[in-house]
């Protein structure tokens, strides 16, 4: 680089130049030289320590041949293309320079290099293998021709120069303009300029005023404004800077920033982003400048790939006050600032009020029919920003490198949030830099530097931008900010816009030269003397840094064949569909980027939007961003005079790969899960930009239709503009009992469009709205304050705006309350997930209610006129709120984004309403409604939302994923396929066998629920569900006093006493009077031990007092005969049956649990005693005392109905007396009775006939105490896991009321009370069964203890406990009365 004095080494002479052949290997940063001029091209600069320097190339050498192709008369562009196509060793034939080293392209092109006055003939491109026609088309598309015209119009007309400018390549260097600025384009050979002259020229900035009347025309000063654009500020977040993988960290940092801003629900404030010559300012309409960021602090910028309205800006700051001087000691921090451009503000009529408020006049944009200050996307903003931070001095580059390095100098250890995958940014020490060659500006720099086409010295994988030869936009050759003349704007047309709006070039409002104003003259002089085209003030270290940046471009950008690069480097990314898949290839053939793409992008950037955006860090809190995170007030980096174009290399190189990473952000943000909502403000409101901080990141968001769901999160207004969004939002409000709000808003919206002259229509609609929503007797009243209430008389003079105030109130209510909850709801998350996966949007009736509110368990079909009733009843169950809370916490722990985590449940009462409101009330066999549901008894979280989850049509069920996730007891999980036609038990049997689990000793739960599932349901309803498998303890219990044995399945963590006490109590026995021991042992069993110690054991309960057992047994044997006749004949028993149902509804009797914890324990114990007494009175009539006790029980049960409905009465509070239980023979009577009692489901009643649910011998057929409920709802049909063991299957199905061979009809069986608790729970679930929902055992205690079988004390184990499955067992259809799991 420091070769300013080299002309002295090679004095020009008459002797012909020495020709030699060299081979240059490509280094990390390219070959290490830059080109200028053409026919032949001349090396304008050779970087110290580069491959070109090692082989002896010097500035001024002419290139005669490249890879055996003669390029002596080839154009500059063709030479650059040839170099760009070479990916390995470059073979060149060069002629050592004989003239001034600093010769420039304009001299050579104009023939000045050899003292001629006209252009040299050019070598035909065909000889070089380059399609000339293609290049012409590219030039036309990119605006190159316009640029030439623009150049010629800005130059003086005297002499042959105008013609030369038209004919020469666009990639001319700045030297000619520099000379022209000094001598009116007729300057002598540049070699005649001394270093002092050049320095003076640069210090005058005259290089930027070529063709202008005077330097004053530009009026350059430090405060000059380049552009200003109105953007919305979302928030800022500090980024980590301690990792080692640049690509990964870039993606993670941006993604993390977006995610946190979404989670914090930022409110977005409108600010004017002003890009000055060396800083970015944020200005509000009230507080003025609230933040200012020097260019030195800018690291890079990035656009959200799925929605280009959103963009981020990363800035740096040190922790110490020493600024850059202490960069080694101070810890460098980086922050990401996220902004949004709202295209809705693009049209002038919409934003003119905002423009007035901010105090500027709009600049018309004839290309887009909008205004430049209000861009339609974030790309124009980023283009100007990238221009600003590309120009940086070496010192700043070092600091920036530190921000993205992990301490060592390895560029690959870059951990920056920016992502230049391999820019030598990290190697910012001088030695390292010298090895980095000035590379082409790949996607963006190409246009900047020369023809905007290919790399001057073979940089970015053959991409190209010419070296630093003058940028092709004639007048603005001063590669001022981005190394490009003003970053030629993405619109070629913008090039003309500038001339249209600003008049002659001399009056351009975007003078890049101003950026240079901060460079000391000494630096500028050094720059000018370093190399010919760089005489524009570029210091040596700037070129070095520039080169390092290009080197990185080369490796990170590699062979993108479409000129696509990050907006950070200034180029406009094409549609994602047009980005080639090989863009990510790191090595291989370096395909040449189409010149047209680069030219077009650069021409647009240079003269495009006159608005700039910048990050703001020190923004003060305003009313609009009180919720936004505080911006870091980090110590400002000392502004350095060495802020030069070196920044451009750093920024651009890093930006190439950051765009790659951001491309991956499309899916990353969604995969991160929680798409939360935000408190948003109206996007057109005065002080805020309504946009959700949750950036909609959907991979398919390429077209409006595909990104429809994501756009709902942008603003509430956007949601209301989409009919589909309104539909889903309405469904959400319906679940929230506030659908009247959206209905009212829609009605008012329609009303406001009624013509004012149509009084009849206005009057009709006004009265309709008033009567439906606003009057005191409104059917669906909306919640508005008293000030907005309308009087009846106002309806006499209706006008379209009469409901505006009320509509605005409801609008704000929905926007700031319902809308934010909608964005957090599972319904919206399901829609987003479906959009990401390319599926059709889910049925809103299928998705559970929003987790945001615990009361939102209403039916999707619920009528808006009954919200209060529904909400009141939905809360009736005491376990409802508790379980919902558990569900919510579970969702927070797991995240609600996974398909199978949607196990939210809905109370039974609500589900009943779901059907009732739509005539789906499940009538029982003879027409009655399920009383238990209608009365809203205890809700169960285990069954929450079970019916809703399966209301979708069969067609949609087929489309849904047919699998579920089962979490096993050992902590592992597996995915199990579910198929229609196979029961849950059949599906699980294979799973249990594979994992060596006894299928009969497990229960299956929904994750987040505590109720076991009924395993005889069709397994297809578990699709996408998250399930939990829990082991249970199986053991046999012998009740010696009554000569009975039962098989039990219990929760292993329960103590023995807690499991046995309720069982023996149901048989009328007292555990305290019994001796508990294991079979074969004489020592009493420790009742405090966990029940898991009894797994597979036989437990014997013996009477300590043998006489009591005899009496009890004898009396119980005879009791059923009397009870049977009494029940069949006595009308009082019909009353008893009815009350039994009431008791069952309220308190379905449990198997498990000690009643000692209840305040009513004394009463319960008395009841048990009375039951035992009643059992003793066989063949005796009920006396007066007993009748009184009976009526007392009845009255208490009736009085407890209210408590039950309010969730205050626990089911264990009441125990059904034995004399109220029907004997087996009465089941026929119950089945044939005309009016079935409420509480019995249709399926329960018809279970015997339709499903063939046979009863096991002891459990049902021979038990006189079996209640109607238990008789009609066989445990085997609905029990979780199974009701009875295979051993009990020896009883074949038979008609109701019949007994199996060998049964003893007169033998009493108190265990039916135990079964009563379980069967009633399933009986209550029958409506869900009809609705296709998942059935769960609703009794809270059933999960802890389950009756597996019952028999005589001499019965073999096989009849009581299911044997463990053998490998030969194959799952088959469930047989009633069997218990195979």
Swiss-Prot record:
What sequence ranges are listed for the domain RBD?
962-1032, 1034-1104
Which residues pair up as cystines?
none
What is the UniProt domain comment for this protein? The GoLoco domain is necessary for interaction with GNAI1, GNAI2 and GNAI3.
Q: Where is the PID domain?
A: 223-390
SUPFAM superfamilies tied to this protein: PDZ domain-like, PH domain-like, Regulator of G-protein signaling, RGS, Ubiquitin-like
Organism annotation: Mus musculus (Mouse)
**GO BP term, pick one:** negative regulation of signal transduction
**Location (main, coarse):** nucleus
Cross-link Glycyl lysine isopeptide (Lys-Gly) (interchain with G-Cter in SUMO2): located at? 195
| SMART domains to which the protein is assigned, alphabetical | GoLoco, PDZ, PTB, RBD, RGS
Where composition is biased (Basic and acidic residues), the residues are: 914-923, 1102-1117, 1151-1169
What protein name applies here? Regulator of G-protein signaling 12
Residue ranges, compositional bias (Low complexity): 849-869, 1261-1280
Q: Where in the cell is it found?
A: Nucleus; Cytoplasm; Cell projection, Dendrite; Synapse
Query: How is the quaternary structure described?
Result: Interacts with GNAI1, GNAI2 and GNAI3; the interactions are GDP-dependent.
GO MF terms held by the record: GTPase activator activity
Record bears the keyword Magnesium: no
